[in-house]
UniProtKB/Swiss-Prot annotation:
Pfam family, any one: PS_Dcarbxylase
Subcellular location: Cell membrane
Post-translational modification: Is synthesized initially as an inactive proenzyme. Formation of the active enzyme involves a self-maturation process in which the active site pyruvoyl group is generated from an internal serine residue via an autocatalytic post-translational modification. Two non-identical subunits are generated from the proenzyme in this reaction, and the pyruvate is formed at the N-terminus of the alpha chain, which is derived from the carboxyl end of the proenzyme.
GO cellular component: plasma membrane
Designated name of the protein: Phosphatidylserine decarboxylase proenzyme
Species the sequence originates in: Neisseria meningitidis serogroup B (strain ATCC BAA-335 / MC58)
HAMAP family the record matches: PS_decarb_PSD_A (MF_00664)
Length: 265
């Protein structure tokens, strides 16, 4: 296990909100006493929501890690809409009490980032994957396998933040994005990946292994090479006489012609 923690325990995305809530709570406390209680509740909730603790990271090179905390809502064979290939799809739904920073599920190089505008339906629904605002990161793992992980906005979450771009190298567990206030992440893996979770399972970001992905793609069966055709000598037939036969026939024709000349004389 490896412990990766290159960021504060409270996500930077929450600093303005927490700072504002704290200042307002103190001000109302001084002026109005117990009337400040709702403001303190909001500030504590913001602290809880924007927490971003360090996690233990599995080092198995075949492990694909959960990029977020949450609950598994989809494990199925599906079509990766960004690569147009069959894939193993695993979706994680995050409620407002989960850690909402997104981290890389594997050591990989980002090849493309695709942003799509959309709606803000409940992220727990299947149609959220295709209808909601979303941001897809297409990447190639260190072993050359292609994976896709998609940030999907939700009913309350209306701000997707992505800090990576094409060409960037991400280490497993490295922070690359954030979605505020409830959302979803869809993972598309090669079809030979073996799911290690089931629908309903609770997962912990970068500590839970979602799937095992072989380092090399399965070999496709190649067609057997055809054997070279045997070269056979031409068959001698009446329509295809040999050179020796042609010589004999020519000599016989000459003799016959000579005999006919003698008879004429």
């Amino acid at each position: 296990m490896n412990r990766l923690y290159p960021h504060p325990i409270i996500a930077r995305e929450g600093w303005p909100i927490i700072g504002g809530g704290l200042a307002l709570s103190l001000l109302v406390s001084i002026c109005c006493g117990w009337w400040s209680l709702p403001f303190w509740v909001f500030t504590v909730f913001a602290l809880q929501f924007f927490r971003d603790p360090a996690r233990e990271i599995p080092l198995n090179p075949e492990a694909v890690l959960s990029p977020v905390d949450g609950r598994i809502v989809v494990v199925e064979r599906a079509r990766d809409p960004y690569r147009d290939v069959d894939a193993l799809k695993i979706s994680i739904f995050m409620n407002v009490f989960n850690v909402h920073s997104q981290k890389s599920p594997a050591d990989c190089t980002v090849t493309k980032v695709v942003y799509n505008k959309g709606k803000f339906v409940n992220a727990d629904l299947d149609k959220a994957s295709t209808e909601n605002e979303r941001n897809a990161v297409l990447a190639t793992t260190a072993s050359g396998r292609e994976i896709t992980f998609v940030q999907v906005a939700g009913l309350v979450a209306r701000r997707i933040l992505c800090y990576t771009q094409a060409g960037a190298k991400l280490s497993r567990g490295e922070r690359y994005g954030f979605i505020r206030f409830g959302s979803r992440v869809d993972m598309y893996l090669p079809v030979d990946a073996q799911a290690q979770v089931a629908i309903g399972d609770k997962v912990t970001g970068v500590s839970t292994v979602l799937a095992r992905l072989p380092l090399t793609a399965p070999q496709t069966e190649s067609e057997p090479e055809s054997e070279p055709a045997l070269q056979t000598a031409p068959v001698e037939t009446a329509a295809n006489p040999s050179a020796e036969q042609r010589q004999i026939e020519a000599a016989a024709a000459k003799i016959q012609a000579a005999v006919q000349d003698v008879l004429k004389d």
